[in-house]
Regions:
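Acidic catalytic loop of the alpha/beta-hydrolase fold
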Residues: 221-225, 249
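Catalytic active-site module of serine/aspartate enzymes centered on a nucleophile-bearing elbow/loop
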Residues: 247, 251, 255-278
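Primarily recognizes the serine-hydrolase "nucleophile elbow" in alpha/beta-hydrolase
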Residues: 104-166
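Alpha/beta-hydrolase active-site loop
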Residues: 87-112
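Short beta-strand/loop motif that positions the catalytic acidic residue
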Residues: 209-210, 216-218, 222
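N-terminal cap/lid segment of alpha/beta-hydrolase-fold proteins
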Residues: 1-31
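Short, surface-exposed "cap/lid" segments of acyl-processing enzymes
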Residues: 29-74
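Short alpha-helix in the alpha/beta-hydrolase fold that links the catalytic acid
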Residues: 51, 212, 225-235
Length: 278
């Protein structure tokens, strides 16, 4: 296999922004101008499951791959896999995540000279796919989108109105993390932020504005994000390609992943993506 190199770095925070932990995997002989920036999903993180193996395979095929943890995903710089920072998790919202993508793209272009004129692609899994779509509608010069089991809207994923009323009354709502057994808090501001910015946080309108190519990869056995989401995304894409597989929401992968191979469905998606971007 061709050699790759990997470096970790932190995009420093400000008084108003938390730091973002990143890693960049690229071909050992770096000669291309292609970069995928990957957005993880809800309760996810950059080192989940097979994401490191996926980064390696893209780099082995000449495409650099950057993964990052959203600044408020609940991880920390020193403990990026579990969720020790529940305060940050509770303060997260969609607007913060879209801004995080903007910060990452800007940092890459300013700090890595060999990417200053790169073709930049956004890839997102599940909720991260929607964030990638919205970010692409900003003036970031994104070349293409790759959406993995992506949601097609956020509004329908909120609970029923009676639950929203309880959420508002209590100020916080808890969701279980089955992996860590934690009760993860969502402050009501998460919902209020969506309501206040609904027109901006609209995946359909964002995708219709995006003039580049979009690859939509989705499993027909996905129980977390129904396949109809993929059909929606495809219908809204100006240049859309749908890749349908008989697989689940994580394409046969899980966390932790202790194997040294990529599950078949995810490997097929990587191969399809490489072809799509060539």
């Amino acid at each position: 296999m061709p050699k790759t190199t990997k470096e970790k770095f932190v995009i420093q925070g400000t008084a108003y922004e938390k730091p973002i932990l990143c890693d960049l995997t690229k071909p050992f002989q770096h000669h291309d101008k292609n970069l995928i920036i990957f957005c993880h999903g809800y309760k996810g993180f950059k080192d989940w499951g097979c994401w490191n193996l996926m980064a390696d395979k893209f780099a082995q095929n000449g495409i650099s791959f950057l993964k990052f943890n959203f600044s408020h995903n609940g991880g920390t710089i020193n403990n990026p896999i579990d969720f020790p920072d529940l305060k940050a998790f509770s303060e997260n919202n969609y607007s913060i995540e879209v801004n995080d993508v903007t910060r990452v793209v800007s940092y890459v272009k300013n700090e890595f000279t060999y990417f200053s004129n790169a073709k930049i692609y956004l890839m997102g899994h599940s909720r991260g796919g929607g964030i990638a779509c919205i970010a692409s509608s900003r003036d970031l010069h994104i070349e293409s989108l790759i959406l993995l089991a992506s949601v097609s809207d956020y509004k329908s994923r909120f609970p029923e109105q009676c639950e929203i009323d309880k959420w508002k009354e209590n100020g916080v709502r808890y969701v279980e993390n089955k992996r860590t057994k934690q009760k993860l808090p969502h402050l009501y501001q998460f919902y209020q932020n969506y309501v206040d910015n609904e027109s901006i946080l609209n995946i359909e309108s964002s995708l219709k504005k995006f003039s580049g190519k979009t690859l939509i990869c989705h499993g027909t056995m996905d129980l977390a994000v129904d396949f109809q989401n993929a059909l929606n995304l495809c219908s809204w894409s100006n240049i859309g390609c749908l890749f349908k597989l008989r697989t689940n929401h994580t394409f046969g992968s899980k966390h932790p992943w202790n194997e040294n191979h990529i599950p078949t469905a995810l490997d097929q998606i990587i191969e399809k993506s490489i072809s799509f971007l060539s």
